[in-house]
Amino acid sequence: MFQKMVGRLREQEILTDALNSHRSELIAIYGRRRIGKTYLVRTFFDKQIIFSFTGLSNGKRSNQIKNFMLKLNEVTNNFKGDKQPNDWLEAFSYLKIFFKGIKESKKKKVIFIDEFPWVDSHKSGFLFAFENFWNDYCTTRSDLIVVVCGSAASYMVKKIVN
């Protein structure tokens, strides 16, 4: 981990603490575009990322959900024949089903959602469903790290950090 990157020592310490935690962790990373947020997460958690999803710029809710399900189907074939979820609550229920099939262990598993603010368009229901996924499922396990990343700093601070 540390040997792959130069700099970002404080950030690497925070990510290491999450790996060593005895509970699930939610990490929000935000900042201007093109400063290496995604690189930091992908490089540091290279082997631990189990599910990764990047929001679509100006994407409609239906396209965001379709993209989410396509990414989920890249890591499991369990949902290939299923119809596309109607909303984010249903989409996150598929992610729960996927993780319920992975035995809980001391080894951390990372869920990475990049460009998080792009997914939460007006009336999309994404943030509500994400909060439900985190509170209702992730916090009941001790082996998950959920990393959300975004360039819209004001959104990330207002909706995630605070």
Tell where the protein language model's regions lie, with residue ranges.
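Phosphate-binding site recognition
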Residues: M1-N162
